[in-house]
Amino acid sequence: MSTTLDQYKQVVEFMEVCNQPVNTTRTFQTSKIANLRIELIKEEIFGTGELVDSINKDSKVGILDALCDILYVTYGAIATYGCIDALGEYEITINNENRKSQLLYKHNALTYVKELTDYFEQFKRGVEIGDSRTISDGLVRIVSSCVSFARVSGFDLAGAYDEVHRSNMSKFCKTEKDALDSIEFRLTEAETLPNPAKRVEQKDNYTGAYVEKSGSVYVIKRGKDGKGLKGKDFFEPDLSKYA
């Protein structure tokens, strides 16, 4: 059995390796951290290749991947703002024997997109007016909506999320040299990407990136906001068996 709290704890593990603050009591954030948390959720819902894009392309794997990513960054925001007290622990595992995945009709899928948009705006509004209750309500509702979307679609969200977590933990490098080499590798790789938007995004991410030691690993961080970036040994999650 896998629960929302189990998923939250996996994100906390990732954040602690990245030396990102994890708060267990309600905590407001400075503009830099607040803006990062807002942009991370916004990107996973509306960004290129993310949820809305995957719905429009009828991509079950893309939709599931986006739901996992939205959950990951939302749990991260819950940890950052210390809203763990508002996160209910409920089961996300479904019976694989009876599981049959399906693409939702567009109007049904867009109902979830509207929900997620409304809850994201609620979170954002809470950040802007400094209201902890509004922040936590928006975040936990995003979690609930993602879990519901996956369940109705017949996706194995528990298995997929574990795969995404393993993938995220592979971002880290074993030595400082590996991390520095990874920055150069990703900058060179960016020049070969066929998607112009992804090419620009990757170049922007790794230009000015820096390396930070955390315990026994080295973390590559984006220069403008400290977001953890992928090392050269990062592997993409294979979610096809869960979708």
Regions found by a protein language model. Name each.
Residues M1-A243:
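Flexible "arm" and connector segments at domain edges
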